[in-house]
């Protein structure tokens, strides 16, 4: 099944999109924040403002031109203004899941992957993001939802959960005048 953006156009491999919540009133798109003792923003969070689109995220898969459901993806933020503290990788900030089950960005080239453990799956007429421990396309049983968990500083952390996914939609990030 080919996935579509808010305009009804297919999601294209290698293109950047804002990942936005379907539900209103609980925050906006996804971005990076400092959590814990981080000196540089490395944690993927939902913005507190529902009017904020967050950061554009590039969706990439080795399999097809169009992004379909249940295919392995890498997801990486592509901020227009690089974070100086991220050094050489500031233009491509690939997502990964840490042992804490929080989604963070890879801190080194060694942690980055050619194709990733994430997938987009249809969910209640929209979509959800999932994390799959197995990189095989046929192991859907190994996939768990990505949802929101609120920490002590009221950050809306993107985390691996059993159930209660963040239901999302995709808006093109490269439209003239939008950025």
Curated annotation (Swiss-Prot):
Modified-residue entries (Pyrrolidone carboxylic acid), positions: 1
Subunit and interaction comment: Heterodimer of an alpha and a beta chain linked by a disulfide bond.
Organism field: Leucaena leucocephala (White popinac)
Extra information: There are two isoforms of the beta chain with slightly different molecular masses: 4764 and 4765 Da. These isoforms differ in their N- and C-terminal amino acids.
Main subcellular localisation: secreted
Listed GO MF terms: serine-type endopeptidase inhibitor activity
Pfam families hit by this protein: Kunitz_legume
Disulfide topology: 40-85, 132-143
Name of this protein: Trypsin inhibitor
Site positions (Reactive bond for trypsin): 64-65
GO cellular component: extracellular region
Domain of life per record: Eukaryota
């Amino acid at each position: 099944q080919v996935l579509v953006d808010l305009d009804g156009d297919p999601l294209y491999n290698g293109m950047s999109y804002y990942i936005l919540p379907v539900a209103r009133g609980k925050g906006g798109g996804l971005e990076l924040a400092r959590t814990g003792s981080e000196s540089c923003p490395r944690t993927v969070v939902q913005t507190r403002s529902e009017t904020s689109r967050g950061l554009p995220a590039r969706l990439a898969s080795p399999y097809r031109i169009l992004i379909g459901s249940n295919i392995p993806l890498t997801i990486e933020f592509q901020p227009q203004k690089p974070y100086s503290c991220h050094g050489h990788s500031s233009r491509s900030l690939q997502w990964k899941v840490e042992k804490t089950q929080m989604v963070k960005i890879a801190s080194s080239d060694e942690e980055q992957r050619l194709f990733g453990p994430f997938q987009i799956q249809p969910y209640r007429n929209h979509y959800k993001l999932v994390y799959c421990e197995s990189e095989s396309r046929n192991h859907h049983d190994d996939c768990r939802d990505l949802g929101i968990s609120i920490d002590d500083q009221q950050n809306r952390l993107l985390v691996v959960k059993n159930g209660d996914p963040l239901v999302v939609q995709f808006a093109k990030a490269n439209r003239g005048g939008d950025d």
